[in-house]
C-alpha cells in the first residue's frame, strides 16, 4: 500500500463522504480516516502475527467516543473519558456483527478493529462512518478479510424511504433501520419501527441494500488503488487420521444423544459420549493439542448431525415442527410491592420483568455525543449464571446484556404513551431466570405483561419471537422460536418483535455470507404467525392495562402556570420550591412552558403542594375579598397575608369606620380579618381595606332596617 496520502470521495445521501489513507496510524495493518460531512472517524485494523491457541476467532471491535468530538469536557473530577457509554457498546456490536462472518473458518489470529470518533456532525452518522471505515481498514490491510461490507440507515417519511436521515428527518420517520451486507446479500439488520407491516420492512431493507452495493463498489476502487496483498495464514485444521478415528468411536452414540428431547438430559447424554472419548485419549497420554482437536471433532459431529436432522429429516432437537412454538405460561402481579410484574415462560426459557413508575425528574440523563439529553423509558436486562445452571462471578452488565436490554427498549418504545398522556418515567428490569434460547424476546413479552399489570396505558401489547435458519447449499429450513442449540449451531438468529398491527423491532445476526430477499420474506411472515400466537396467549392472562395504578406507585398531578411565574415558584436559590418539598414530601418538576408535575405516593400531599403553588402564582385582582391573617403590625397599618407568599397592607385609615389612634386597638398579630383589595400600585404592592367592607355591611344593615319599617 502506498504510504502517500490519498483521498477518495463519494456522494452519500446528498452529503460528501471522503476517505483518506496513507497519512494516519501507518503502523496498523490498515487505517483510514472517514469524513462524512463534518463527522470524522479514524478506523484501524490490526492482527497478531501468530494464531492464538483458542477454539474461536478472537475478533474485537471497539467504537471509542471522544467528547472533544462535540466540544465537551468530561464531567467529574477525573476529566477524561471513562468506561464506554451504552451507545458506544451498541455501536461496537453493530459493526462487529456484519464483519465477523467474513473471516475464514479456522482463522485464529487475533484481530482488533478500533474506531475513534474525532468529530461529530449530528446529521451525518458516526456509526455508519465507522462501519465503512472498519470494512475498508480490513480490506486494504493484509489481514485475510473476505469483504468489503457496508451499512446504511434507512428512514421513512410520508411513505418515502430516505437514506441516512438527518436528526430532523429521524423525528418524522416511522422506521429506524440499520442494514449491512456484502454486494450480494444482507448479513445484518437492526431496526426499530412504529408498528410497520412486514412487507414495508422488507422493502426498506432492500432499499438500503441498493445503497450498500454502491458503497461497496466505492471501497473496491480504493482497495484496487491502495490495498496490500493478503497475507498467507495457516488456518486451524484437525488431523485427518484423528478425525476419522474419533468419528468411528463417537458418531453413532452422539447421533443418538442428540435426539434426546429434554435440554439437560440431552446435554448429559452428549457429555457422556464426550467424556468417554476424552478418557480414551487421556489413557493414551495424548497431549493438550490432541485433546483440543478431539473436542473440536466432537463439536463438529454434533453440529453436522443437528443441521442434517433439521434440513434433511425436518426434525428439531426437541422434536418440534419447524414453525411450532414451545409451551407458553404467563402470570402477572406476582410481586406485591412492585408497581407491576410479569412472568413469561416459553419452554425452558423464563423471564421475570418488573415495571417501576417514577416522576419525570427520574429520567436518565445522557451525556454523550448524541443530541438526546434524557430518556423517560428504560429497559434493563440481566442474565445471571444460574439461569443456565452455571456458576460464575456476579459482575456488571456486559455487552450482551446491554445489547439485549436495548433491543427490548427499542421494541417497546413505540407503544409507550406520550408524556402528556402519561407523565411518568418508566423503568423495566427483566431478570432471566431460565435460559434455553430467545431470552431477549421473552424479556419483551414479560415487560409487556409487567407494564399492563402496572397500569401503563400501552398503545398496543408487544410480543417477540426469535427465528432461526439452517442452510446447506440451496436447501434451507426456517425455524420458529429457536432454542439454545439451534441458535448456537444454526446460521441465523432473527429476532422480530411487534404488535398485532406490525413490527416494532428487528435484529438479525447470521454466520453465513448473507441472506436473499426470499429467505428474509419467508422468515418475516413465519415470525408474524408466531408473534400473533404469543400475543393471544398473553392477552388471555391480562386483556388490557389495569385502570388503576399500584397503591405503591407515585400519584402525579399536572398543572399549568404562567411561565413568568416559574421564578416565583422556585424562589431565590431554590428556597421556595425546597420549602414546598420539605413541607409536603413531594417531587416537583417544572417544564419551561409552565407545566408543573407534582408526584408522591400520598395524594393528600400532592393536593397540598398544588394549593401552595396555586397561591404562589395566583394574581391578586382589585375588588377581590380575602380572609387573611395579620402577619405584622406597624404604626401606619397592618400587613395581612392573603395567601401563601402574598401580603397586602391595610393602612391605619382603612382599618375601621371610626378614626383609629393605634393599630393594635383594632388588630393584633395572628388575628384573621376580612379585607378587600382596593389598589395595586405600579410596584405591585397591594393596598387593602377593612373599612370598605365594614361600610358595605353597615349599609346593608341600614337597608334591611328600612325595608323592615316599610313592611310594618
UniProtKB/Swiss-Prot annotation:
Mg(2+) binds at residues 487, 493. Its EC number is 2.7.7.8. The keyword Cell division does not apply. It comes from the Bacteria. One of its GO terms (cellular component) is cytosol. The keyword Nucleotide-binding does not apply. It is found in: Cytoplasm. One of its GO terms (biological process) is mRNA catabolic process. InterPro entries: ExoRNase_PH_dom1, ExoRNase_PH_dom2, ExoRNase_PH_dom2_sf, KH_dom, KH_dom_type_1, KH_dom_type_1_sf, NA-bd_OB-fold, PNPase. Keywords: Cytoplasm, Magnesium, Metal-binding, Nucleotidyltransferase, RNA-binding, Transferase. SMART domains: KH, S1. Residues 623-691 form the S1 motif domain. Transmembrane segments: none annotated. Residues 554-613 form the KH domain. Its cofactor is Mg(2+). It catalyses: RNA(n+1) + phosphate = RNA(n) + a ribonucleoside 5'-diphosphate. One of its GO terms (molecular function) is magnesium ion binding. Involved in mRNA degradation. Catalyzes the phosphorolysis of single-stranded polyribonucleotides processively in the 3'- to 5'-direction. Belongs to the polyribonucleotide nucleotidyltransferase family. This is Polyribonucleotide nucleotidyltransferase. It comes from Bacillus anthracis.
